[in-house]
Amino acid sequence: MALLDFFLSRKKTTANIAKERLQIIVAERRRGDSEPAYLPDMKRDILAVICKYIQVDPDMLSVQFEQKGDDISVLELNITLPEAEETQK
């Protein structure tokens, strides 16, 4: 009987596939909303401190906040620094 069920089973409809994809997108956005309200201000302050020593483009600074569990938060900071000759003021 299982063989008969295999051949008679229907493929997923496009509506079901779209629903699953939408659920994934919503779940990803919910995770992104967990960043604290102070994060944009912190990014601005970090950029100001870095600019005191090295001239960098604000677009070259990437700050990501990730919640890992209830009591662990990770703040990841990536900066693309200019070449050594350009860093001197």
Swiss-Prot record:
Record's keyword terms, sorted: Cell cycle, Cell division
Record has Cell cycle as a keyword: yes
Domain of life, per lineage: Bacteria
Range of residues in the leader sequence: none
Keyword Cell division recorded: yes
GO BP term, pick one: cell division
Database matches in HAMAP family: MinE (MF_00262)
Family (UniProt): Belongs to the MinE family.
NCBIfam families: minE, PRK00296.1
Function text: Prevents the cell division inhibition by proteins MinC and MinD at internal division sites while permitting inhibition at polar sites. This ensures cell division at the proper site by restricting the formation of a division septum at the midpoint of the long axis of the cell.
Protein name: Cell division topological specificity factor
Organism of origin: Photorhabdus laumondii subsp. laumondii (strain DSM 15139 / CIP 105565 / TT01) (Photorhabdus luminescens subsp. laumondii)
Lineage: Bacteria, Pseudomonadati, Pseudomonadota, Gammaproteobacteria, Enterobacterales
Chain's gene name: minE
